[in-house]
A protein has these predicted regions:
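N-terminal targeting leaders that direct proteins to extracytoplasmic destinations
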Residues: 1-53, 69-70, 77
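Short, flexible coil/turn micro-motifs enriched in small/turn-prone residues
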Residues: 20, 48, 55, 93, ...
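Core alpha-helical elements of the protein kinase catalytic domain
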Residues: 24, 84, 121-122
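Extracytoplasmic/periplasmic, Sec-exported soluble proteins
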Residues: 30, 67-78, 88, 104, ...
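Periplasmic peptidoglycan-binding/anchoring modules of Gram-negative envelope and division proteins
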Residues: 38-43, 48-49, 63-97, 125, ...
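Envelope-exposed proteins and targeting segments
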Residues: 43, 52-54, 58-60, 67, ...
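Short, small-residue-rich loop/turn micro-motifs
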Residues: 58-62, 90, 98-100, 138-140
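Periplasmic OmpA-like peptidoglycan-binding domain that tethers envelope proteins to the cell wall
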Residues: 99-167
Length: 167
């Protein structure tokens, strides 16, 4: 039989063990995501927070002509500026999403959207981003931001978005 002292010691030991287990489960996890400085730069450059991350291009700043896959000079300068700004705050991983309007057949539009995304990736690598840190997607006409029934809407849909994912 256990004496009262032995029971107290055993109970105390059990409580200490349970407290240590609870504390081990409460260890803080290193912070993930973006720093306030990185978020400030993203906002300054015109990125908007979306369900998929911080996206640039929703307001139609990197647009393409109909059936065109190369960036014009103004869009090239925008992508260069963005790439340099991201690197200046140690954002090194992005996703580049190419888009088209709904004109033409979808298999062709997907290929065209990939080529558009590649043209942006090329500029980003020229300013110092590593190609292996850039995910590329060609989405064709699957994610329009405007109606394809008007010329203005189709113009808005011929675009590339740059997305920063905080992980």
């Amino acid at each position: 039989m256990f004496s009262m002292t032995q029971r107290s010691v055993r109970l105390f030991s059990t409580l200490v063990f349970m407290a240590l287990l609870a504390l081990a489960g409460c260890q803080s996890v290193p912070p993930k995501g973006l720093t306030p400085k990185q978020i400030a730069v993203l906002k300054q450059e015109g990125f908007e927070l979306t369900d998929e991350g911080w996206a640039f291009g929703l307001s139609g700043k990197v647009l393409f002509g109909s059936d065109v896959e190369t960036l014009n000079q103004a869009s090239t300068e925008i992508v260069q500026r963005i790439g340099k700004a991201l690197l200046s705050v140690d954002i090194q991983k992005v996703r580049v999403d190419g888009h088209t309007d709904a004109s033409g057949k979808e298999p062709y539009n997907v290929q065209l959207s990939v080529r558009r995304a590649k043209s942006v990736v090329k500029v980003l690598t020229q300013v110092g981003m590593r190609e292996e840190n850039i995910q590329l997607r060609g989405l064709g006409s699957s994610e329009p931001v405007a109606s394809n029934s008007t010329a203005a809407g189709r113009t808005e849909n011929r675009r590339v978005s740059i997305v920063v994912i905080a992980d």
